[in-house]
Swiss-Prot record:
Keywords: Aminoacyl-tRNA synthetase, ATP-binding, Cytoplasm, Ligase, Nucleotide-binding, Protein biosynthesis. ATP binds at residue 243. It comes from Azospirillum brasilense. This is Glutamate--tRNA ligase. Pfam families: Anticodon_2, tRNA-synt_1c. One of its GO terms (molecular function) is tRNA binding.
Length: 446
């Protein structure tokens, strides 16, 4: 059977790096196995699911290059879920409950005060037909719980190894809400069974949920997939990530921070693994290096500063053709390959705007003009200029003035760029050009 893995985000907020890490790991796993990657929107929360968030999920995955083989919405498959729910009701595995949210909160508080886990007491199973009729006559509508078997649930996790849960330590989950809407715990099982999902790779916050869903798979006669539970990412301080607050959202990293997609992918693919984090220019490279067995159970931290450093390393490796579009959006004239080669190490493509100004915009006139610069101006070679011009010219200036080292180069840099530091002048000088260089050496605004 061909490997098939789902990424099932909820369109209730912006994707953050933790969500996208799961998407990337699923995608890498599928591609390494020659299988299929499915995107399935968990839009069962109708109140909080928004079209703009669904569109954002597609935009983020496309930006990263995580192509999918199938795209689905759980809300489109309620018909299939209704059939399964009816069968579970008929078999007695789904039973109606009538407690209000307030009553359930009181039960949980009572259990907590006794130091006991919040496990549902199955009071609804003790209701007779007359009791249910009376409650419904009062206007109460049932929600439906799945009756768990009080037997051990075990599986071999691809990340955590052998996992064991006692069924008696789990609470019967609500699978159908009071308004008749099927919830994620049921819809995801039905979809996984219908779509022949072979592996489910998700966060470790789903461990108890997996134990529950294994029993649901068995109850509906579906093949139980292989599970893998990854440790959840935290920020650099160890705090959890929240997509609803926009914390470290992919959209923000792309649109506000200027992060390259392969910088983010290179980092997220290796966080929490035994591999060194190195810049990669293609997803194919990450696929070749991927092995889920390398994922550690330790909690990985996402450091934006580490991402920015990796972004700079990625930019240093990218050819002009890969950045031409971004460069054109950052500067006010069409850039050239020579300009891209000339700019110093950038953390973001947008920083090229600053260096475009150095080579093409006026540098402010200085109040005093050292005689040395006037002499240097007279020694400027004729054009055309190339990468050897800087060395030829400064050699002539050194021979004429006797200056060397910092006394030679720093005044020239300040006059030509208005800065003390920056890219190699052998690259920048041909972009500045002879006319502009002569004026700047003469102290003119040029």
């Amino acid at each position: 059977m061909s490997v098939a893995v789902p990424f099932a985000p909820s369109p209730t907020g912006l994707l953050h790096v933790g969500n996208v890490r799961l998407a990337l790991v699923n995608w890498l796993f599928a591609r390494k196995a020659g299988g299929n990657f499915l995107v399935r929107l968990d839009d069962t929360d109708e109140e909080r699911s928004k079209p703009e968030y669904a569109e954002g999920i597609e935009r983020d995955l496309t930006w990263l290059g995580l192509t999918w083989d199938r795209f689905a919405r759980e809300s489109d498959r309620y018909g299939a879920t209704d059939e399964v729910a009816a069968a579970l009701k008929a078999s007695g595995r789904l039973y109606p409950c009538y407690e209000t949210p307030e009553e359930l909160n009181l039960k949980r508080a009572s259990l907590s005060s006794q130091g006991r886990p919040p496990i549902y007491d199955r009071a609804a199973l003790r209701l007779g037909d007359a009791d249910r009729a009376r409650l419904e006559a009062e206007g109460r509508k049932p929600h439906w719980r799945f009756k768990l078997e009080h037997t051990p649930v075990e599986w071999t996790d691809l990340v955590r190894g052998p996992v064991h849960f006692e069924g008696s330590a789990l609470s019967d989950p609500v699978l159908i809400a009071e308004d008749g809407r099927p919830l994620y715990t049921l819809t995801s099982v039905v979809d996984d069974a219908d779509l022949a999902i072979t592996h489910v790779i998700r966060g470790e916050d789903h461990l108890a949920n997996t134990a529950v869903q294994i029993q649901i798979f068995e109850a509906v006669g579906g093949a139980v997939p292989v599970f893998a539970h990854l440790p959840l990412l935290t920020d650099a301080t160890g705090q959890g990530l929240s997509k609803r607050l926009g914390s470290l959202s992919v959209a923000s990293l792309r649109e506000e921070e200027g992060i390259e997609p392969m910088a983010l992918a290179s980092l997220l693919a290796k966080l929490g693994t035994s591999d060194a984090i190195e810049p990669r220019l293609t997803l194919d490279e990450l696929v070749a290096e991927f092995d889920i067995a390398k994922v550690s159970r330790a909690t990985p931290k996402f450091d934006p500063e580490e991402l920015l450093r990796l972004n700079a390393r990625i930019l240093h490796l990218l050819p002009f053709e890969r950045v031409a579009g971004e460069l054109a959006a950052s500067v006010w004239m069409m850039p050239t390959p020579a300009f891209w080669e000339a700019v110093p190490n950038l953390s973001r493509v947008a920083e090229a705007r600053d260096w475009w100004a150095v080579t093409h915009a006026p540098v402010a006139r200085r109040r005093t003009i050292p005689l040395f610069l006037a002499e240097a101006a007279t020694l400027l070679p004729k054009e055309p200029w190339d990468l050897s011009t800087w060395g030829t010219w400064t050699g002539a200036v050194k021979a004429k003035t006797g200056r060397k080292g910092k006394d030679l180069f720093l005044p020239l840099r300040r006059a030509l760029t208005g800065r003390d530091h920056g890219g190699q002048l052998k690259n920048l000088l041909p972009l500045i050009g002879r006319t502009r260089a002569h004026k700047r050496l003469a102290g003119e605004t040029a």
